[in-house]
C-alpha cells in the first residue's frame, strides 16, 4: 500500500464516520425496493427478510463478508480482484460501491481497467442502504 493510498484511506474513514452516524436504517429498508429487482436478503435458515431477484448476490450478512465471495455467484473481474486482495465489505466500502460501483472498483483496486457488473448507481441514500444492510443479521 502506498503512502498516498494509506493517507487517503484514513481521510475517507474520518470523513465517512460522521456520515454513517446520521444514516437512516428505516430509509435504507424502504429504499431496498430499488434493489429488489436484482437482490434478495435471505437468512441462512432460508427465511426471507426481503424477497427479490437473483441477478445479484444475496445481501444477507454482506457486512463483514469478503468481497466477491457469495457462493455460486458469478462475480465480475473487478470484485474478484478485490477478493484476491482479501478485501472485506464494511459500511463505508459498501456505501461507496452502491453510489457508483465501477468508479469504486477502479479506485479500491487501483486498476483503471477493472469495472463492476452492477450498473445501478444510488446517487443518494447509499449510506442509508449500507446501514440497513449492516443491521440485517
Please place each PLM-identified region on the residue numbering.
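C-terminal capping alpha-helices of c-type cytochrome domains
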Residues: 87-137
